[in-house]
């Protein structure tokens, strides 16, 4: 229990690293939930591509960090990642939808909302059907991004993992 604040700080440092590379604004809630927004919509859904890459990069670092801690007999935390999209003027409802998906869909992989999973531009650029598992809620469990993106992310994860 005494270690939890230090663990949370370590995970937050990972979020900081990821957002320094992919952009995004970080907000930490009182309950330690972390919200990262990519608030500048760009042509070709680049902001969503950045959000997916950032989430997958964080997920890889998080898994590597947990594996390192487990190898030394140390505790770790289980984190759920949900990627959702919408108008930031409706941030409260977007956050609630993401939180609802997080509570409902406890998955080993990242969860992406229906709006992200079925967006034609994202399906064409970064999502491959064989990496996506439909969930009862209509959301999707995403194991990995398309190879062009995932291969780069895997290299980044390998590069940053030893220094965790």
Which role fits each region the language model picked out?
Residues 35-37, 82, 111:
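Short hydrophobic beta-strand segments that form the core of ligand-binding sensory/regulatory domains
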Residues 21-25, 33:
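A glycine-rich, hydrophobic loop/mini-helix early in the fold
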Residues 16, 59, 102-103:
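N-terminal cationic-hydrophobic initiation segments that often serve targeting/anchoring roles
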Residues 3-7, 29-76, 90-97:
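Short helix/loop segment flanking the catalytic signature motif in cyclic-nucleotide metabolism enzymes
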